Amino acid sequence: MKILIVDDEIFARRTLERLLSMEEDVEVIEATDCYDAFALYEEKLPDIVITDIMMKGGIGGEWLIEKILASNPDANIIVCSGRQKTDLLKYKLMGAKYCIQKPIKYQELWDCIDELMKS
């Protein structure tokens, strides 16, 4: 399974990469911004995209969600954000399959990934 992690914070991105890489049959792809993430999405066709919302450079996760879903309406997107839970509902309505509030609990994230792979 291929998972694309999109986060401008290196610590958050690398922590997720290390944890997910420990799982069997998981290939992790990393992007620091949404432009690179969308290019990697189209090139690598990951099974799941895990993205932050607030990123440096002015283009955030909302743009990425819209671009990916325009390209593939069935894309599996998980939003991980420090925003309030009530704010995360917006991203579910946009088409994200799951929204997780930071700090991320690994088991919660893995449960979401597992559910997406079963469906």
Where in this protein do the model-derived segments appear?
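Active-site residues of response regulator receiver
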Residues: D52-I53
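Short amphipathic alpha-helix used as the core "switch/output" element in two-component signaling
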Residues: A39, E62-P73
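Alpha4 helix (beta4-alpha4-beta5 surface) of REC/receiver domains from two-component response regulators
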Residues: I59, W63, R83-I100, D111
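Hydrophobic/aromatic residues positioned on beta-strands within the core alpha/beta folds
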Residues: V79-C80
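Two-component/phosphorelay signaling modules centered on CheY-like receiver
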Residues: I10-I29
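Acidic, metal-coordinating helix/loop segments flanking the phosphotransfer/catalytic sites
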Residues: E30-I48
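C-terminal output helix
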Residues: I104-D114
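Conserved acidic carboxylate
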Residues: D7
